[in-house]
């Protein structure tokens, strides 16, 4: 007698280029335990959600009933013939093993590995061969006594605590994994999928203590609200558009269709058919990127409301003219209120409706791709929306230990304040429960959705140090080592899944731990799998860091005296930038939000009014900072507005009042600065030597405020010479380096050129002969020169 066990591998994603998918298990060909794992091919099939599933049935002898077996999935894809597809590690903080297991039993059910949970939760299409496709609603609420699906009045888009706004309630049934499900056929109110598209809904959850709560669908693709108003449970009779998105109803959406601004609907494959035109290609290596950091909400100059994705679509022409090949958006997933940076996400699949929603995000991506610009999204997984009363907070229980989305240690009675068991991590909210697969999959699956459905090219993860290094107990600040360990496990699972889905994704992290594992492989190793980490010390040495010991070159130059500058300290940061770093002269955090910070042009003159001669110095030093960033061996990035010499502070609480007219200034007072940026970007992108990681720094002089560094690759050689001296070296500055040889060097770039607004001090684009490693060159005040070896 045998016991047949079905094994299933489900990605939750369409048309992944997986091949040779194989089941590997700790048994021999007869089904007996073996240390030499067998490998058998799995058959590709299609599940009812319309996605690939790989299936195999394996017979085991019944005399092995009770035996513990282990298994996993191996697959191939273009460029890699054998990849281990189990992304998540065992729920043991001391183990990094990636495998699944079961005890053989008579009548055992299917053993399934879900790479992502797309299609398992939310409102999803159910394909039917003999009728119109149905719909399935599914919600994770393991502690609930009961859950009802509540359909809402689309003219209101909100359900009050007393049920006002509901038009139908539908019973849901519980599954063994804590899901609650309702689908077509369960109730007359559940029609076919297409008929349900656009329907607003919520869940009425009876918690474990019997209390009732209305909850949004955490896996929804759209929240109906596009405004700021929170009824706070009271009856609401206003417009759905005025509601704050996280508090409003979720909406059934069809990810296989795109709604254009005109209202016309297109099949996704039709919409994306002209994604790449005229032979334009996207960059495919992180080192080839020049990243423009953009906050959509800070666009819309001249309007009272925050900027939208429509404004961003218009802005792409500016990005294209500037020459950048990547744009990084501050978080665009659903967040509270309109005027917000977006770092408190409530619904990770839904682009903020106030910004235009998911279909507008797709349009933005397509317009960028048509111009050869990759799109990177900033995502925040270290905390949830702090005002998550209808989202993650206390979703199905008021018991702190059963607050399913949040990490909690011990019992409420252990602390003077019952909240003491939550985890602080130097973010604006408590840490997620990273030891729970449903929580991990919320982050993993939403990222997979953005890649597969919205064609996103990469991600920047906000403050990953908060996930794997900073966790402490809220009660007393004790280290929460288990929370940190599972945070690291989550990050590895996330990067592994992304690499399986799309190996060429750009994966960067804001991380200040200096942990080398951050940029070591995760899919083929035990690292955390990121391409690069943000390098804050580059900015701190180059521009400023209030109270810090770093060089702060521009800040100290801004005093206007002749003090020495620690160019040597910046040289160390410049050298380190070659080690898998994203470097920036400014980021969103550094333009005024942090104490002592401000726009580069303001820091460069020590907060003096940027007018007249002072403006000339502000711009000269700003051009120096731009050149150091864009010519470094790191991956360069700068924040919106730097290219026009923006001066107004960019702060969390008043960015709307301080928006800069970037498009207007580009043809006005910012024309010289933008011309300099444009030429620097072209030099950075089109010269392999500049985009290589190769750097040598043969000359640093703190008293003279001079630095020179060499960039090279495959026969190309460039010498970059920068000076922050307040006077030019008009009679020449002698550079010594054996790297200069006896060769001829041609000046190909000068930040002090008239066309950039400079004083035009330099070598006139001439050629200078080095002799025995010595080269004499005229250096401008607060300027940067680039020479090419001939």
Regions found by a protein language model. Name each.
Residues 1-8, 93-145:
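Non-catalytic, glycine-rich low-complexity segments
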Residues 13-65, 75-100, 138-198, 206-229, ...:
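Aromatic-rich carbohydrate-binding modules that target alpha-glucans
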Residues 139, 203, 294, 319, ...:
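Conserved, mostly hydrophobic/aromatic
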Residues 219-221, 266-286, 295-483, 494:
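Substrate-binding/active-site clefts of carbohydrate-active enzymes
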Residues 230-296, 548-614, 765, 771-777:
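Glycine-rich phosphate/pyrophosphate-binding loop
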Residues 481, 489-653, 685, 692-695, ...:
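Conserved alpha/beta catalytic core and glycan-binding cleft of carbohydrate-active enzymes
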Residues 662-697:
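Aromatic- and carboxylate-lined catalytic core of secreted/periplasmic carbohydrate-active enzymes
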Residues 762-790:
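C-terminal beta-strand-rich structural cap/linker in extracellular carbohydrate-active enzymes
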């Amino acid at each position: 007698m045998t016991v047949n066990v079905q094994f299933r591998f489900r990605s939750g994603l369409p048309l992944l280029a997986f091949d040779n998918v194989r089941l590997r298990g700790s048994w021999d060909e007869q089904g007996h335990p073996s240390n030499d794992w067998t490998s058998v091919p799995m058959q590709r099939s299609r599940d009812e959600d319309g996605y690939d599933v790989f299936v195999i049935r394996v017979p085991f002898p019944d005399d092995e009933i009770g035996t513990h077996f282990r298994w996993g999935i191996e697959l191939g894809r273009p460029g890699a013939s054998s990849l281990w597809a189990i992304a998540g590690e065992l729920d043991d903080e001391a183990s990094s093993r990636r495998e699944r297991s079961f005890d053989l039993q008579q009548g055992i059910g299917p053993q399934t590995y879900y790479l992502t949970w797309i299609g398992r939760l939310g409102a999803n299409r159910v394909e039917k061969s003999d009728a119109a496709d149905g719909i399935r609603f599914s919600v994770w609420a393991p502690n609930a006594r009961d859950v009802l699906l509540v359909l809402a009045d689309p003219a209101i888009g909100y359900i009050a605590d007393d049920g006002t706004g509901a038009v139908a309630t539908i019973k849901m049934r519980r599954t063994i994994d804590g899901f609650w499900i309702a689908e077509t056929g369960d109730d007359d109110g559940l029609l076919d999928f297409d008929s349900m598209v656009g329907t607003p809904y919520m869940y009425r959850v009876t918690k474990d203590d019997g209390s009732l709560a209305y909850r949004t669908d955490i896996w929804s693709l759209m929240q109906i609200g596009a405004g700021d108003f929170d009824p706070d449970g009271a009856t609401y009779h206003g417009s759905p558009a005025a509601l704050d998105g996280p508090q409003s109803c979720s909406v059934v959406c069809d990810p296989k269709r795109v709604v254009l601004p005109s209202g016309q609907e297109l099949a996704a494959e039709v919409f994306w058919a002209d994604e790449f035109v005229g032979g334009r290609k996207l960059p495919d290596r992180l080192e080839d990127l020049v990243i423009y950091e953009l906050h959509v909400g800070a666009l819309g100059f001249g309007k009272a409301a925050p900027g939208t994705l429509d404004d961003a679509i218009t802005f792409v022409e500016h990005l294209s003219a500037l020459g950048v090949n990547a744009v990084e958006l501050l978080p665009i997933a659903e967040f509270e209120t309109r005027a917000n940076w977006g770092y408190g996400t409530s619904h990770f699949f839904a682009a903020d409706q106030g910004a235009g929603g998911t279909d507008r995000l797709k349009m933005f991506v397509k317009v960028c791709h048509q111009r050869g610009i990759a799109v990177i999204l900033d995502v925040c997984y270290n905390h949830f929306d702090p005002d998550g009363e209808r989202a993650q907070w206390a979703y199905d229980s008021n018991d702190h230990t059963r607050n399913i989305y949040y990490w909690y240690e011990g019992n409420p009675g252990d602390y003077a304040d019952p909240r003491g068991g939550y985890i602080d991590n130097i973010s604006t909210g408590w840490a997620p429960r990273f030891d729970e697969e449903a929580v991990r999959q919320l982050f993993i699956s939403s990222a997979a959705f953005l890649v597969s459905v919205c064609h996103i090219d990469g991600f920047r993860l906000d403050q990953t140090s908060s996930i794997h290094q900073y966790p402490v107990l809220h009660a007393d600040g004790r280290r929460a080592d288990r929370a940190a360990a599972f945070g690291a496990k989550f990050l590895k699972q996330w990067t592994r899944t992304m690499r399986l889905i799309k190996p060429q994704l750009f994966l960067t992290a804001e991380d200040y731990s200096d942990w080398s594992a951050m940029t070591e492989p995760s899919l083929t190793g035990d690292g955390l799998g990121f391409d690069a980490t943000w390098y804050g010390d580059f900015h701190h040495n180059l521009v400023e860091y209030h109270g810090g010991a770093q060089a702060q070159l521009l800040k100290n130059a801004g005093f206007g005296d002749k003090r020495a500058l620690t160019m040597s300290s910046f040289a160390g940061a410049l050298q380190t930038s070659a080690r898998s770093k994203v470097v920036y002269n400014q980021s969103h955090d550094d333009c005024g939000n942090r104490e002592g910070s401000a726009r580069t042009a303001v820091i460069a003159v020590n907060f003096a009014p940027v007018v007249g001669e002072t403006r000339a110095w502000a711009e000269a030093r700003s051009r120096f900072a731009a050149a150091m960033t864009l010519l470094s061996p790191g991956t360069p990035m700068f924040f919106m507005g730097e290219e026009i010499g923006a001066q107004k502070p960019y702060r969390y609480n008043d960015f709307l009042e301080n928006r800069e007219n970037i498009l207007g200034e580009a043809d006005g007072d910012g024309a010289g600065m933008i011309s300099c940026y444009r030429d620097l970007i072209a030099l950075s992108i089109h010269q392999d030597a500049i985009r290589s990681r190769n750097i040598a720094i043969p000359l640093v002089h703190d008293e003279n405020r001079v630095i020179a560094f060499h960039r090279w690759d495959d026969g190309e050689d460039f010498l970059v010479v920068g000076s922050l001296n307040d006077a030019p070296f008009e009679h020449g500055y002698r550079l010594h380096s054996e790297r200069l040889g006896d060769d001829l060097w041609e000046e190909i770039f000068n930040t002090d050129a008239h066309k950039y607004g400079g004083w035009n001090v330099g070598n006139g684009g001439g050629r200078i002969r080095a002799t025995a490693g010595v080269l004499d060159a005229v250096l401008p005040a607060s300027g940067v020169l680039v020479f090419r070896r001939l």
